[in-house]
């Protein structure tokens, strides 16, 4: 095996998906603890930056105390290199969250044991399904009252349409939480709470049918054995291929706060989740072990340092290796650039990167030339697919406070749209500018950034738009007919694509019925 193939085989790149407050932040910290990378990485840190600024580097994040931006953390674990991509978990997140899922090979779903499957989890799972991403599940908060575990598994299967295979099974919960039983390997992992940054030594009881197990479970023993028989009869067994195909999820139980069960999940990612996978480009399929470098940009983050109008483009490496100072071709622009200062997202010690391999995420300094979906290679003209725009769910009309600044407004919105902070639509029948977003917070982010970076003050007005759909139609004549009939609701997005702004769900359904030759798409590839 070449050194490069060996490095790729060591990589595991995954994201955590959850509803807000299911415990994602806590589990992220505990995962870093497992990797001993406890210089808790938020985003790229400079040595001088204080801890507070680590992750919440935008003013607004500081005020609200939430992390809007998706950060990347790399840490070693069991001779592997883990790349963990965090996704904003706040009530309001953005398209960034969705797009981050295009850059990973697997995902960890965290559920609150007291609440089960929640709306945000469903939305994120839908995105994972676009690429059949393998999912590992962690049912959290066993140190509190939780719902019946069998009920939780049924809910995962019914709502998320994925088979659930329990790997561990909880023994009690809340004050009676005694640990978990490993179904396949027949041993008990005893619960001892390890708070903060301690890693507690794991105590194991071999075999459920033992005096030690009977003593540990006490009066609960008989009932637990009965419950297990029921579970083993009713639940799916783990199947590696079904997991890789995104059809089955292994389920673990624990408490991130009590630092229990998190290592089981990380072991599952290392043992079962795929190493960096081949990626499909328009021209061909790119294998990770290929010698030549290639990668795509899935996210752009602004102002990591408020003093500079600097933006960092996050790139997933798909093949080859990055070496400091190497020359890359920026395919969309057809230009060669030398990259000497890519950033890595390791602990604070290593901020300038010397080398990186397929599966790793690197940060490129971007002075306005890089867009989401851009491909970088060692010369070959490739364009990776599968980095979509998602139809916004919320819309506002922009009102400018100073009409003389309309040029700055358009310029600012154009850049923020390229970055993925918002989507912008220009209706064909008016001079309005309409913004679309996935979470309300995106509108606040745009307003504050327009003010800080472009000195433009704007306000928002409500507008009757239910959803947006990108229009495709192979038949030119039909398309023309459609455009004439639907002109009141047609707009062009920031990339110049024809978009239908549906005022209501019913209206959209009627239009789709009336115009069978016209495709109304809910996602659009970056080109």
Swiss-Prot record:
GO terms for biological process: regulation of translational termination. Keywords: Cytoplasm, GTP-binding, Nucleotide-binding, Protein biosynthesis. GTP binds at residues 18-25, 86-90, 140-143. Residues 9-277 form the tr-type G domain. One of its GO terms (cellular component) is cytosol. Belongs to the TRAFAC class translation factor GTPase superfamily. Classic translation factor GTPase family. PrfC subfamily. This is Peptide chain release factor 3. It comes from Pseudomonas savastanoi pv. phaseolicola (strain 1448A / Race 6) (Pseudomonas syringae pv. phaseolicola (strain 1448A / Race 6)). The lineage of its organism: Bacteria, Pseudomonadati, Pseudomonadota, Gammaproteobacteria, Pseudomonadales.
């Amino acid at each position: 095996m070449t050194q490069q193939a060996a490095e790729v085989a060591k990589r595991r790149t995954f994201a955590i998906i959850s509803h807000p407050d299911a415990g994602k932040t806590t589990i992220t910290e505990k995962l870093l603890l497992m990797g001993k990378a406890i210089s808790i990485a938020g985003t790229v840190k400079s040595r001088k930056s204080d801890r507070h600024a680590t992750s919440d580097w935008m003013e607004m994040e500081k005020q609200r105390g939430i992390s809007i931006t998706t950060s990347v953390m790399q840490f070693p674990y069991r001779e592997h290199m883990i790349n963990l991509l965090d996704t904003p978990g706040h009530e309001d997140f953005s398209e960034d969250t969705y797009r981050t899922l295009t850059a990973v090979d697997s995902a960890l779903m965290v559920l609150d044991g007291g609440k089960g499957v929640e709306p945000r989890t469903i939305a994120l799972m839908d995105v994972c399904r676009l690429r059949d991403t393998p999912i590992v599940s962690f049912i959290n908060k066993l140190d509190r009252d939780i719902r019946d575990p069998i009920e939780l598994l049924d809910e995962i299967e019914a709502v998320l349409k994925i088979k659930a295979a329990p790997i561990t099974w909880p023994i009690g919960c809340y004050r009676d939480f005694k640990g978990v039983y490993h179904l396949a390997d027949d041993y008990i992992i005893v619960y001892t709470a390890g708070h903060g940054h301690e890693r507690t030594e794991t105590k194991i009881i071999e075999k459920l049918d033992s005096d030690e197990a009977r003593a540990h479970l006490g009066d609960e023993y008989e009932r637990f054995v009965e419950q297990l028989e029921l579970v083993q009869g009713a639940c799916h067994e783990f199947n590696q291929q079904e997991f890789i195909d995104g059809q089955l999820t292994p389920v673990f139980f624990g408490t991130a706060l009590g630092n229990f069960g998190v290592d089981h999940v990380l072991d599952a990612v290392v043992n079962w989740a795929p190493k960096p996978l081949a990626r499909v480009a328009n021209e061909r399929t790119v294998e990770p072990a290929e010698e030549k470098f290639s990668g795509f940009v899935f996210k752009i983050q602004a102002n990591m340092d408020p003093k500079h109008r600097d933006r960092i483009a996050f790139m997933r490496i798909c093949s080859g290796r990055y070496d400091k100072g190497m020359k890359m071709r920026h395919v969309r622009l057809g230009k060669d650039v030398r990259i000497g200062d890519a950033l890595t997202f390791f602990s604070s010690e290593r901020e300038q990167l010397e080398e990186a391999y397929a599966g790793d995420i690197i940060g490129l300094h971007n002075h306005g030339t890089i867009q989401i979906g851009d491909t970088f290679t060692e010369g070959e003209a490739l364009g990776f697919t599968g980095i979509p725009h998602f139809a916004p769910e919320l819309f506002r009309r922009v009102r400018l406070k100073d009409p003389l600044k309309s040029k700055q407004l358009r310029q600012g919105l154009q850049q923020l749209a390229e970055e993925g902070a918002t989507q912008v639509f220009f209706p064909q029948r008016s001079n309005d500018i309409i913004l679309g977003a996935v979470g309300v917070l995106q509108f606040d982010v745009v307003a504050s950034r327009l003010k800080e970076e472009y000195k433009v003050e704007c306000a928002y007005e409500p507008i009757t738009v239910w959803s947006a759909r990108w229009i495709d139609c192979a038949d030119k004549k039909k398309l023309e007919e459609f455009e004439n009939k639907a002109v009141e609701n047609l707009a062009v997005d920031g990339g110049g694509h024809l978009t239908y702004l549906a005022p209501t769900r019913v209206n959209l359904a009627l239009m789709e019925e009336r115009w069978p030759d016209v495709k109304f798409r809910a996602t659009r590839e970056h080109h």
